[in-house]
Amino acid sequence: KPEEDWGHK
């Protein structure tokens, strides 16, 4: 989900 996807920045 997007919330955990922030780690790719």
Swiss-Prot record:
One GO CC term on file: extracellular region
Tissue distribution of the protein: Expressed by the skin glands.
Predominant subcellular localization, coarse grouping: secreted
Keyword vocabulary terms for this entry: Secreted
Top-level taxon: Eukaryota
Cell compartment(s), UniProt: Secreted
Protein name: Skin secreted peptide P1-1
Protein's organism: Phasmahyla jandaia
Source lineage: Eukaryota, Metazoa, Chordata, Craniata, Vertebrata
